[in-house]
Structure formats: C-alpha cells, structure tokens
C-alpha cells in the first residue's frame, strides 16, 4: 500500500511539473513588487525590456558617483545578479534534463521573447555626497525612475544608491521585462539588524558573508555579532591571547583581527555596519576563565557554582583593568561607534553566594541592585574612553542609569 501511494504521489507530482513546464510565459510585464515595500511606488503605463548583457550599462552620472569605489563594486555585483543568465537561455523548471537521460520529461523550449520595441539601455546613477561614513545618521534615501530608454537613480550617499540598485534588480523580471515607474524610498528605521551568535555556534567566514548578502537583499544595515558567551570565546585579543586560546572551541574556531577586518569590509561594501557584543558580567564561565580555575582562587570569576551563567568578580579593581585591556582590543577590531555590553540574566544570589563579593557589598553598603549599578557605571566609563556608545541587552540597567543611555533592548532580545 505504501509503495502504491508513493507511485500515485510521484505521478501526481510529474503531472503538475509538466503542466508548469507547458504553461506559456507572461508576455506583458507584471508590476514587480519591491521588498521591503518602498515609501512610494508609482507605476507607469509602459513596459519594455532590459537591453542585452553586452549593451546594458550602469552609468556613474556625476563626479561623486564616478569616484566612489563602493558604488562601482555594487554595480558589478548587481550586474551579475541581474544577468545571471540571458532570458533566451532560461528554463522554467530547474530540474528538467536537456538530454532526457535522467528524468521523464525534457526541458521545455525557451520562452519566446516579444519584439523589444522599448529597451532600457542604461541606469544613470547620481549620488549627492562623496562621504562614505557609515553610521546611524547615514542617509539611505533614493529616488528611482524607470523611463525608457534610460532609467535614473538619485541618492544622497553611496549607501542609498546601493538600496536603489537592490530595488532596481528586484524590478527586473526573469525574462528581463520591466515596467516604467518611479520609486521614492527611505528606511522607516535607521537601525535594522540581525544577530548572529558566534559563541554558541561558530560560523565560518563564507557563511557569514552569505548572511551579509542576504541582509543586503533585504536592505538591512547592522550585523550584531554576539561574539562571546558561556560556550566559547572565539575573539582573538592581541593583548589577552589566553582568552581565545583557552576559551575557543579549538584553534580553528576563532575570529582574528584580520578575519574581523575582512568581514567588516565585506559588510561595509553592502552598506552594513558590524557591532560586537561581549556579554558581561554574566555568561562568562567557562569561556572567560583563562586559567581554568573557578571559585575562590580565580581572580576573574565569582564563586557561585549553583548559578551556571558565571559572573565576573565585580568587586576587584583588576577586573576593570582586565575589561579595559580587552575593550581596547575590541575597539581596534570593531571601529563602529556602538558596542553592546550584554547585561542579561544577572542574579543577585550569585554575588551573595561569593564570600569575596558579599564582603565587598557589605563594606560598601550595597544590595544587589546597587552592585549592578556600580558595575554598570564602571564599565560605561571604560566604554566612553573608547568614544563608543553603549548598548545593553537588559532592562535592568535602564532602571539604574540616566536617560542618556543610548538604547536598551528588553530582556528576550
């Protein structure tokens, strides 16, 4: 019975695929939708086709555009995306077999491309400013006008031009048809991020680059690297090499300053910033224990074995010296103005269980919240010396600090 059902399912699937293969392609270009939805998209009444690969051109239309290396890189990328294959060579089923050797149906004939009476020859790109700084205030605005025979793209910066190129690529349909229209667009939010947890799951560089590509297709602009946590410490600190030597999964599962610089350059070429998170004061054991000692003999971690997240010895001046040294290396590797300090899942019971920390709290007249605030202020002072804005992952810090705190992400980020 199982075999019969499988055969019936296979026959049904074959029939469905054959029906798709024999369907006639749409000759009148539909209105392609852009993702994310633009602020304004006005469709025209005419439709035409992109010129062939050897004739279509992106044109840097003003001196700022002509001098922009990131823009020229983006034009090369999007030309490759648009012209992955010529329409005449396309098949509507990727798994058909031209020689009929493996599957039971041949490839359908290539789609018939109508006479190209309206042909888009160029996309002229103009950028208003040569400034290539990428920050929270960077403009990503653009205006895209598709009018035959030449389209135009105007942007304040090269990063706005990148967003416009992405929209243009989405407008081109598989048969290279495109409809006249105008798009006026700007991001609703200046900070549009995804987070990758490279402590729990070390990710190879090619995979991170593929993730950055996917972000650029969705016009996202911040990669948040949760780079350290309990499972591993993959960041190679030049001043504290023992951290990754002892804390990484192995010597191959690390991110050296050279690797990070490569990722940041790859991201910036796509209009994406990279910010780092080193989660403190919890989520530090065992990866932050460079000598493999926990408890009373540790000069870095508190003795609270019942609380597996691990906590720093916030009572010791040496802890802040250690953090200052580490953050100096972090700021060199990650030049962005925003740095995430974690701060989630803190538990007062851990510090109360540590004899040394409990003694410090008693001497200072601190309760758990007071100690949290003390640590936060000390850490924020260190971060400020690096000319960085701080970003935390717990609402608890926001209860202890002034409203000048840059941003607070609620627990559960």
Predicted stretch roles:
Residues 303, 308-399:
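Active-site neighborhood of glycoside hydrolase catalytic domains
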Residues 1-3, 274:
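Positively charged n-region of N-terminal signal peptides that target proteins for export
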Residues 4-12, 17-190, 390-401, 405, ...:
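Acidic, contiguous N-terminal accessory segments
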